[in-house]
Amino acid sequence: EMQRSLVGSEMCIRDRFKYVERFSHVMHIITDVEGKLRSDKTCFDALGSTLPAGTLSGAPKIRAMEIIDELEKTKRSTYGGAIGYISFNGNFDSCITIRTGVFKDGKAYIQAGGGIVYDSIPENEYQESINKASAVLRAIEEAGDIV
């Protein structure tokens, strides 16, 4: 997806192999990808070409998004979007908003999910979703103790 904004096929995986990064409630496979933008593209084009992230939408992306729209009762809102920064020297970095609470009218709204693939075990995927949501819930509880 990002390749559409890059010069030729100048996209490379910085670390030849993916690595696992451990967080408080879950683990993620991380891969750092770099590329050189075409002269007619900006970092916004590169970011836009990757959203929503395939890891959250599934593949093929357009059909997967149609199915999500048909089946999910609640819109994803900021979930699955991106938060990031652009520095004055042109550096750009972003992350997917997958563990984020949205506060509205005195309530916190939290969305979490897991990836379902051919050999998924439903109970494990459900527990993964609970683990992901619990990290945000715990942060809200701890913030409430401070405020």
Question: Where are the model-predicted features located?
Answer:
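Conserved hydrophobic core element of enzyme catalytic domains
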Residues: 25-147
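Single conserved hydrophobic/aromatic residue that forms the stacking wall/gate
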Residues: 1-8, 12-13
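Gly/Ser/Thr-rich active-site loops/lids in small-molecule metabolic enzymes
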Residues: 14-29
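Compositionally biased, low-complexity linear motifs
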Residues: 10-18, 92-99
